[in-house]
Amino acid sequence: MKQSVKAPAKINLSLDVLHKRPDGYHEVDMIMTTVDLADRIDLTLREDGLISVDVSEGFVPNDEKNLAYQAAALLKARYHVNEGVSIYITKRIPVAAGLAGGSSDAAATLRGLNDLWQLGLSLDELAVLGAEIGSDVSFCVYGGTARATGRGEIIERIASPPPCWVILAKPPIGVSTADVYKRLNVSAIDHPTTEHMIAAIEGKDFDGICHHLHNVLESVTLDLYPEVRNIKEQMKRFGADGVLMSGSGPTVFGLVSKESRVQRIYNGLRGFCHQVYAVRIIGSAGS
């Protein structure tokens, strides 16, 4: 038996970091939404009880370090599943980009194996399991649009933003999330009012959403990596309505309301950035 599952990327419309917790994680308050740039997870049952992972992208681990492998191993051990699974990941989401590609692969594996192994778990139960794998996995189990608090595992699903285009641009650099958080001084930065973003989303106020885009991690990443700052500036110059870095970077996204501007922005960015994508916000979960 086989199962194919999409694993969409996410962007942060708002990302606030409140403080470092005693357990070493940071307390966050984020608004995330999924876009229609997605990896594909192909799951094939195997009778020998083993788990294997193959990936189309050479830079992604294909062993126990892979989050999809960890998701399968967790489900198999927790629910005493005898069967194994072969996992093939077709990567479309850029790697180490701030778009939760690995977390989304893990979440898609949880959802797909829940069906394939006939476990009958709810999304809420899968999200709790996802939190054991990584902070973004719980959100990715649901997809759609949500507020994430705690270390990212407490999910409150909210309405979807109005339909719009999203331009994604990833410079050819890697960003250490741990280093960004280590350098972040939460007492010396401006913090977003997350409720304002929620109100704009629920009111389908595109201009309000663009106005309230805020990511406190930009205060670190833009100084460490001038390439990210340059992409933000160029995206604004080419005509994006709202521009923000996603996660800890280095990917920058631009929200665009008019399709007539999308190609111009895309072409302009492709002049100096190889990984550029024109996608749409998916909308509600399950779309």
From Swiss-Prot:
This is 4-diphosphocytidyl-2-C-methyl-D-erythritol kinase. Belongs to the GHMP kinase family. IspE subfamily. GO terms for molecular function: 4-(cytidine 5'-diphospho)-2-C-methyl-D-erythritol kinase activity; ATP binding. The active site is at 10, 136. The gene is ispE. InterPro entries: GHMP_kinase_C_dom, GHMP_kinase_C_sf, GHMP_kinase_N_dom, IspE, Ribosomal_Su5_D2-typ_SF, Ribsml_uS5_D2-typ_fold_subgr. NCBIfam families: ispE (TIGR00154). It comes from Halalkalibacterium halodurans (strain ATCC BAA-125 / DSM 18197 / FERM 7344 / JCM 9153 / C-125) (Bacillus halodurans). Its EC number is 2.7.1.148. Pfam families: GHMP_kinases_C, GHMP_kinases_N. It catalyses: 4-CDP-2-C-methyl-D-erythritol + ATP = 4-CDP-2-C-methyl-D-erythritol 2-phosphate + ADP + H(+). The lineage of its organism: Bacteria, Bacillati, Bacillota, Bacilli, Bacillales.
